[in-house]
UniProtKB/Swiss-Prot annotation:
This is Uncharacterized protein HI_0352.
Length: 231
C-alpha cells in the first residue's frame, strides 16, 4: 500500500509464487504472508488447475532440484486465467552483464530476509535458462498458449518470435526521486498483533527460560569438561 500512496506502482493482482511441496514450515510461512498482506493470492492454488504442469514442477523440485523463476511462474498463472497470447519481456535468464536484476539488490532489508543477496552473484543454482525454457515450451505444448517476445534485444527473442503487434510507443524510463529502494518490512508490533513471533512465545517467557537453562546446565558442564580434556 505504501508504494501506491507514493504513486510509485500500480497493480491488478499480487500473486505469491508458492510451491505446495516444500513442507509444513514453508506452508506456515505462506499463511503468515497472507496475514501480513491480505490482498495476496497464493500461486499454488493456480498451479493446481494445471495438473500436468504442476506434476512436472513438483517432480523437478523434489528429484532434480530445479525451480522455475517467478516470471515463468506468472506465465502459468496467466494460462490459468485464460490468456492465450503471452507477450513477454524481462525474462532474461540472468544473461544480463553486471547486475542480473532490474533493481539494486544489495539493500539492508533484502539482505535481512535473503542473506545471499549480499553477494554479487546471488541467484540460486536451482534456476537455469534450460529449465525456464522447457517450462515455457511445456505451457505451449500442453495448453496451447502462444508466447511472444516484445523486446528485440532480449535473449527471449532467440527462442520465441517477436510480437507481430506494431506498437509505435517507445518506453522511456522515468527517473524518480525519493522512491522506495528496498523491501518494506512491517514494524515488529504488526507481527505481534497477528501472532507471528521469531521464536515460539514460550521461549520469550523469563521463567521458562530460567528453568530451561537450569535443566541444560549439567549437560553444558559435561561438554565443557570434555573440551578441557583435549586442550
Amino acid at each position: 500500500m505504501q508504494l501506491i500512496k507514493n504513486n510509485e506502482y500500480e497493480y491488478a493482482d499480487i500473486i505469491l509464487s508458492s510451491f505446495v511441496n516444500l513442507g509444513d514450515s514453508e506452508l506456515k510461512k505462506i499463511k503468515n504472508v497472507q496475514k501480513l498482506l491480505t490482498q495476496v493470492d497464493i500461486g499454488h492454488y493456480y498451479l493446481n488447475k494445471l495438473p500436468a504442469f504442476d506434476a512436472y514442477l513438483q517432480y523437478n523440485e523434489l528429484y532434480e532440484n530445479k525451480r522455475i523463476t517467478s516470471g515463468v511462474y506468472m506465465c502459468a498463472v496467466a494460462t490459468v486465467m485464460g490468456y492465450k497470447d503471452l507477450y513477454l519481456t524481462g525474462i532474461d535468464f540472468y544473461q544480463e552483464k553486471g547486475n542480473p536484476y532490474a533493481f539494486h539488490h544489495q539493500k539492508e532489508n533484502i539482505i535481512k530476509l535473503l542473506p545471499s543477496f549480499s553477494q554479487n552473484k546471488s541467484q540460486s543454482d536451482i534456476h537455469s535458462m534450460e529449465y525456464d525454457l522447457n517450462a515455457l515450451y511445456f505451457l505451449q505444448k500442453h495448453y496451447g498458449v502462444n508466447i511472444y517476445c516484445i523486446s528485440p534485444e532480449s535473449p527471449l527473442c532467440n527462442y520465441f518470435p517477436l510480437s507481430p503487434l506494431n506498437n509505435p510507443i517507445t518506453f522511456i524510463l522515468e527517473e524518480k526521486k525519493n522512491y522506495t529502494q528496498d523491501i518494506l518490512i512491517p514494524p515488529k508490533f504488526v507481527y505481534k498483533k497477528i501472532g507471528i513471533y521469531s521464536k515460539p512465545r514460550i521461549y520469550q517467557n523469563l521463567i521458562f527460560r530460567l528453568i530451561w537453562d537450569i535443566l541444560r546446565l549439567p549437560n553444558d558442564i559435561k561438554h565443557a569438561l570434555k573440551s578441557r580434556k583435549w586442550d
